[in-house]
């Protein structure tokens, strides 16, 4: 054990000291890739061959991970410097894993990093997918993912009926123009009941006399998981929407991480109006 720890300490000290390694260039086609969080896991699992994945995050196979089935059987690693560096990856992929300074640290330690980032709208989701695919050396796979996404969007545009939808969370929060959720509602051929921009409390007064055709419920498997007794979702007017309107339950794996898999949520909302 001592023989293992000593060189690791030396490696970490060299990465943090005066003799920092020069920032490594990203390989054209990385073959020893480590993913530090479950958002990064999705892209690594979708775009890379399994033999090129050195390790995934501990959450890769959890229920809220969209690519959880593909993660089965692959090694995982904690997003700590010592655990990652000892694997000697040729590329690290991350969104938030390892903390805010992780990207700078790994680059200075000589390990190139792909930062997944966040996307505010559907076009940027596709642009981000292609950028990540390019950086992973899998441009064609990224283009294929985007082509499929574009086809699914085109199919939905033919089903537009203008019914009204309201996005609801256990905390009683909804969202309007300017959010990715709003774009998803519109992509499903629906009209968002929330017309004010940004994230806001559900419009209880309006719901007292007007109901949506569809509720997009982001309760992730539970309609009773309220954060506290003061949540607007405790109000009878809000609860009524779950029985008087068509309800589509959105899986957390569909809407988290702002990836191509949000199309599952979009299609579920579109199909909800046809029941």
Predicted feature locations:
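Alpha-helical, coiled-coil/dimerization segments enriched in small aliphatic residues
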Residues: 58-64, 70-73, 174-203
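Proline-aspartate-enriched helix->loop->beta-strand connector
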Residues: 76, 80-94, 201-220
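Basic- and aromatic-lined ligand-binding clefts that recognize polyanionic substrates
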Residues: 31-44, 140-189
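C-terminal motif of bacterial Sec signal peptides marking the signal peptidase cleavage site
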Residues: 13-15
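A short, structured surface patch at a secondary-structure boundary
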Residues: 32-97, 101-102
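Sec-dependent signal peptide recognition
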Residues: 1-10
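Bacterial signal peptide processing site
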Residues: 17-20
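Structured C-terminal subdomain patch of bacterial secreted/periplasmic proteins
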Residues: 123-134, 143, 160, 220-275
């Amino acid at each position: 054990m001592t023989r293992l720890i000593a060189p690791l300490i030396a490696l970490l000290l060299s990465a943090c000291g005066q003799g920092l390694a020069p920032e490594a260039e990203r390989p054209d086609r990385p073959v020893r890739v480590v993913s530090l969080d479950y958002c990064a896991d999705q892209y690594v699992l979708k775009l890379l061959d399994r033999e090129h994945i050195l390790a995934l995050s501990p959450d890769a196979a959890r229920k809220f991970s969209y690519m959880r089935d593909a993660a089965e059987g692959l090694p995982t690693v904690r997003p700590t410097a010592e655990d990652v560096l000892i694997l000697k990856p040729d590329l690290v992929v991350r969104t938030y894993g390892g903390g805010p300074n992780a990207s700078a640290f790994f680059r200075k330690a000589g390990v190139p990093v792909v930062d997944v980032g966040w996307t505010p709208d559907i076009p940027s989701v596709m642009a981000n997918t292609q950028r990540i695919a390019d950086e992973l050396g899998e441009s064609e796979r990224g283009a294929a993912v985007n082509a499929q996404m574009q086809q699914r969007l085109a199919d939905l545009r033919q089903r537009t009926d203008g019914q009204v939808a309201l996005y609801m969370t256990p905390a009683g929060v909804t969202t309007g123009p300017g959010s990715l959720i709003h774009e998803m509602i519109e992509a499903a051929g629906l009209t968002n009941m929330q017309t004010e921009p940004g994230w806001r409390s559900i419009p209880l007064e309006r719901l007292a006399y007007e109901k949506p055709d569809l509720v997009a419920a982001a309760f992730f498997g539970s309609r009773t998981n309220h954060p506290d007794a003061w949540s607007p979702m405790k109000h009878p007017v809000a609860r009524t929407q779950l029985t008087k309107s068509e309800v589509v339950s959105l899986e957390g794996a569909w809407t988290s991480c702002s990836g191509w898999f949000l199309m599952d949520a979009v299609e579920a909302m579109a199909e909800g109006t046809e029941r």
